[in-house]
Amino acid sequence: MKAVVLLSGGMDSLVTTAIANAQGFELAAMHVNYGQRTWHKELEAFRLIADHYAIGERLEINADYLAQIGGSSLTDYSMPISGADLQGLSIPTSYVPFRNAGFLSMAVSWAEVIGAERIFIGAVEEDSSGYPDCRKVFYDAFNAVIALGTKPETSIAIMTPLIEMQKSEIVRKGMELTAPFELSWSCYKSEGKACGVCDSCALRLRAFERAGMRDPIDYEQRPDYI
């Protein structure tokens, strides 16, 4: 069975790809550039990870309309990337409004064309930034939309294998599957060394700390988040 993997190049999408690969799916990898600050590094990570898993069927999409819409510090350079607040309950400025719905729509379109029956996305509801489009209920609803909006003979379902996992569990799962974490990129701010202090870096570093392992990528700072 063929599956589309939404592969940003980050830690979660890497482990999701490793899981789909281990389950024996024929993988097709999709990457979206949406005008984010670190798009060069994320695209590089996507290509390296796709090479690692020998994924030949790939789609790189330009969706910079999200940068034109704005509203996120990832795409609007007038908004600073805020430092990590792992105890806060508010949605951080890095949230890109309704981004995942757009990504999923593109993935469903491609899946329908190439005959893929599954779409894997590395969304995490637990132990994450609290983005509303990373909740299980959102993906359950989107599966209903797919059933209504595709051809009757189409059978496409979204798979979210990480949705209820803690970040440290994701690290351990990746290690179990020998996922190449050194090829992935999570930093929202930098394309040289990861900053170590943005929300995404903090969640990643804390996950590795809790898993009792050292993150293999380079950081400008490595604060202790435990």
Curated annotation (Swiss-Prot):
What pathway is this protein a component of? Purine metabolism; 7-cyano-7-deazaguanine biosynthesis
Task: Answer yes or no on keyword Nucleotide-binding.
Answer: yes
Q: Does the keyword ATP-binding apply?
A: yes
Q: CDD domains from the entry? A: QueC-like
Sorted keywords for this record are:
ATP-binding, Ligase, Metal-binding, Nucleotide-binding, Queuosine biosynthesis, Zinc
Per the UniProt entry, the Enzyme Commission number(s) are 6.3.4.20
Residues holding ATP: L7, S8, G9, G10, M11, D12, S13, L14, V15, T16, T17
Q: Please give the InterPro entries that the UniProt record associates with this protein.
A: QueC, Rossmann-like_a/b/a_fold
Q: Quick one: which residues bind Zn(2+)? A: C187, C195, C198, C201
Reactions it catalyzes? 7-carboxy-7-deazaguanine + NH4(+) + ATP = 7-cyano-7-deazaguanine + ADP + phosphate + H2O + H(+)
Which cofactors are named for this entry? Zn(2+)
Instruction: Kindly report, in one word, the top-level EC class recorded for this enzyme.
Output: ligase
Recorded superkingdom:
Bacteria
Q: Which Gene3D superfamilies match?
A: HUPs
Molecular function, one GO term: ligase activity, forming carbon-nitrogen bonds
Q: Which Pfam families match?
A: QueC (PF06508)
Per its UniProt record, what PANTHER family does this chain match?
7-CYANO-7-DEAZAGUANINE SYNTHASE
Q: Which NCBIfam families match?
A: 7-cyano-7-deazaguanine synthase QueC (TIGR00364)
Name the family the entry cites.
Belongs to the QueC family.
- Protein name as it appears in the record: 7-cyano-7-deazaguanine synthase
- Gene source species: Chlorobium phaeobacteroides (strain DSM 266 / SMG 266 / 2430)
